[in-house]
Structures are given as C-alpha cells and as structure tokens.
Design a protein with these regions (language model features):
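Single, function-defining residue in the core of a domain
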Residues: 1-284
C-alpha cells in the first residue's frame, strides 16, 4: 500500500521503489552478480521453493545457458525418461519427454537397493554417503536434469542439477554448503539484530541490512585470523568447531580489556562510557 501510494518513506535515492515478488528480487540480484562473471558458468543453489521455472526461465532468458539451477526436489514431483531419437521420421514435432518414470518418492523406493557409497566432503569433514543418480526430464523446468537421491538411515532427499557435467559428489557438496548460508541468515537476523530493526524508511532498511551483513563478515574475518581456534562455550555433541556467538564473546571481552584501552585514547572520557561497556557485555 505504501509503495502504491508513493509515500516519501518508500523512496530510495530519491526514486519510489517498485513492488517486486521474491522471485523477481532473486532474479534481479543474480543478474547483477552475474554481470561481474561474464562467460563463466553460474550455479544457483536454492531450496525447493525457488527451484522452479519462476526463477530459472527469466535467468536463462537474460543470461543464456551459462546459468544452472541446483535445488531439492519435492517428493511428489513426477519424473520422465529422456525421449528416444528415432531414425524413422513421423509426422508432427518430436517428443519432448519420454515415458513416465514415476514420482520422486516412488523412484527413491525403487533405487534404494542400487545406491552406491560416495566419499563426500560435507559439513567440515569427509563422510560416506549412500546415493543413486540418474538423468531424467523435468516438466517443471522443461529440460533434462541429473537427480541424486541421498539415502540416510530412515529418510532420503532428492537433489537435482541442470548442469549435467556435475558429479554426484559435487552436487551433494554444493547443496550441503547451502546450509552455511542458512546459518548466516540466522546470525544476521538474530545475533546481529537485523530482524529487530525499527526503521520505516526504505533507504534506512537497506542501510541497516548492509551494515548488518558487513558486521557479520568482519566478525568471521576476525575469527579466521585468530592464531588459536576459539573454544566452544556451549558444548554440542559431535561438534568441535566454534560458533558465531563465541567470536562475539571474544570481541566483547577484548574490547573491555586493558590492552584495548591502552590503544584507544582514554584522555577524553565520555559520560556514556558505562553505558557502552554495558552494551559490550550484553553483546558477549
């Protein structure tokens, strides 16, 4: 409503912001990034909500065959075989799809016994993963895709890629890396506080999210340059790596230390010093 009313608080750089759906925003951002990598294959890794023609078609139209999609398949998605190219010419246009193979869940049950073990670098270490791969036709994207069924003890997931050159290991590793992005969103929204912004101005909202992303990036750069690996404050079984909150605690502790005060000028003491110290302790 505010955008349609062309309110002053909906202006960015003096221009009124036009309404865009999530898919339209995603397409625009990917195209902006792709302009810096001309002639290079681009793989978009996303969840099943974005893994459809609403994202893929406009990207292919704008960027061509250099862009590929890697996403998760829904269990009820129907898959088809690759159409056979016959030597005999029949009237009408050639078939785009072969025979119906079944739903993703039906094929998972059929392929479970034929799964192979792959050595995949996943979540910080090499793991053995049982998976099965097959190239099929996907009607939602209207193109051939490589589907990888990953089988766990009691569950399974199906991942697909429009880039048929990718190996099974690469498809699993790329999709597994997506969860690092999910944790990054959590850090920016909850730990940094982006979701708690009280701004009502479009430009202020953009500035706030940019500063939040910058703050999270600086914290991780700081953590990568530490000589010793930080100790995890909240122990979790099976996890040895440190968390984002551990880095925040180290930075807050360092900012309140005598060494930090020795570097900073303490001659001009501000009346808000105690308040700033309280904020730093809260951050830690």
């Amino acid at each position: 409503k505010a955008i349609n009313a062309k309110s002053d608080n909906m202006r960015v750089a003096g221009k009124v912001v036009s309404f865009q759906t999530k898919l339209q925003q995603a397409v625009e951002m990917v195209i902006q990034v792709a302009q810096h990598f001309a002639g290079v294959d681009i793989i978009i890794v996303c969840d099943s909500w974005f893994g459809n023609n609403g994202l893929f078609k406009p990207l292919r139209t704008k960027l061509g065959n250099f862009v590929h999609l890697l996403s998760r398949l829904r269990s009820n998605t129907v898959l088809y075989s690759i159409p056979k190219i016959g030597s005999s010419k029949k009237p009408g246009r050639p078939k785009k799809y072969g025979s119906r193979l079944g739903s993703c869940a039906e094929m998972a049950a059929a392929f479970m016994a034929y799964a192979s073990t792959y050595h995949v670098f996943l979540y910080g270490k090499y793991r053995e993963v049982n998976a099965y791969s097959q190239i099929v036709m996907l009607k939602t994207l209207k193109c051939p895709v490589r589907v990888v069924w990953v089988f766990r003890k009691t569950q399974w997931i199906a991942i697909f890629s429009t880039d048929l050159k990718l190996s099974v290991e690469q498809i699993i590793e790329y999709y597994g890396a997506r969860w690092k992005i999910e944790s990054g969103f959590k850090e920016i929204k909850q730990d940094i506080g982006s979701s708690k912004s009280q701004t009502r101005n479009a430009q202020a909202v953009i500035n706030h999210i940019n500063f939040s992303i910058m703050a999270a990036t600086i914290i991780w750069i700081y953590g990568s340059r530490l000589e010793n690996i930080p100790e995890r404050r909240h122990k979790v079984k099976g996890r040895n790596s440190f968390a984002f909150s551990d880095l925040r605690h180290i930075i807050a502790k360092s900012a309140l230390s005598d060494d930090f005060h020795a570097v900073c000028n303490q001659d001009n003491k501000l009346p808000r010093k105690s308040f700033l110290e309280a904020l730093l302790r809260m951050v830690g």
